[in-house]
Amino acid sequence: LLRAAIHTMQEVVEVGHAHGITFAPMSTFEPAAYATLDDIDEKLITVPQLMHGSRDLEASMLQDLQKGQPTEIRFINGIVTMYGNTYDIKTPFNSLIQEIVEEAQAAKTVPDFETSVTRFAALLNA
């Protein structure tokens, strides 16, 4: 899943840069470093360190799904996909996230973790 997270971040940064967005550093996290997949092995080490402080938090989108409420997926990953299409940048990871969440939202359920992992593994191995 870490590889999928890094690919997702790379898509966000690449699309953002194409749209003229400059990402500000956050603490020790430098979003611009994720504009490419270079040094992915190093990123596989640093991403868990960056996420360590928030490991016990539950995402608001997950909370929405648990309550059967609409999520903000179209305004987060959906925007990345939309602008990716505008700039002819492929965004398969953000698209898959949006697809998984929208399927769960329509079914008023929470995505099955193992099924989602399998879908990301298929994308990584494509």
Protein language model features and the residues they cover:
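NAD(P)-dependent Rossmann-like dehydrogenase/reductase catalytic/cofactor-binding core
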Residues: 2-126
